[in-house]
């Protein structure tokens, strides 16, 4: 009889453990701030309410409207509705559509949503965001007026980006996103884009491949600076490995020589920006323009001093390249 009682107790505890491990930790999630604002940057934790709407047996549509749709309505109505076209627009640009897909959001791949949310709660996201935004405000010469939402979505495609500084999103369920790396290392990268955008828009060649290369490379370099160079250069550039970095260094001269002719291209569809499509360097382990931009910016700072990275905000992409003497460096390789 004692053995039977003990077996039943083990089974009950095991059953409870399984249920707990296969559901959201609503108590921890509820403690996360709805939003965090430092100066002109606001980060909305929309995913919090998307989860809490499912806390009770009956789905709470009011939370979705009040805490998910309305706080960043411009993102849903404008950015998502436009990106995914007329067929999907009604999912995002009205309350009814938002409630409908959020109701069934976790019906499929719920374990994946739970695992990613667990990653977020273990990071202590409130502390992380606050400290990052405070440090960012001390470092940069200009504070963007920006809204960024951390969210789940039924159709992923933005990743970490958006339509403008007021319509930015991090899709937590996007399969291409490494949640831990993006939250801990990716935020400074994206924030620097928002700062540089203000100055880059004054460049008549702002849509050139070179401009996009400097933009991405500068964001990577800023990440390196943001973490006081306590991360490696290759980690700052798309979180690549040492092996990836070594491949780029080995092929540095050839990369520059073969991509230089595309610097003025305005199409956005060229081997420098889309090596994945054009296969100019089929063996390249990561994105060419991120790495090349980082190298150009690095050479600029190497020439003008450790704080000279701040100059780049007010320089055109052509000026950064010319002043860096990167081409002269390449010619000597």
Q: What are the roles of these predicted feature ranges?
A:
Residues 68-79, 150-157, 318:
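Acidic helix-start/capping segments at beta-turn-to-alpha-helix junctions
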Residues 21-58, 207-253:
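Post-HExxH zinc-binding segment in Zn-dependent metallohydrolases
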Residues 1-4:
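Positively charged n-region of N-terminal signal peptides that target proteins for export
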Residues 77, 252-333:
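Pan-zinc metallopeptidase signature
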Residues 95-238:
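Acidic/His-rich structured neighborhood in mature extracellular/periplasmic domains
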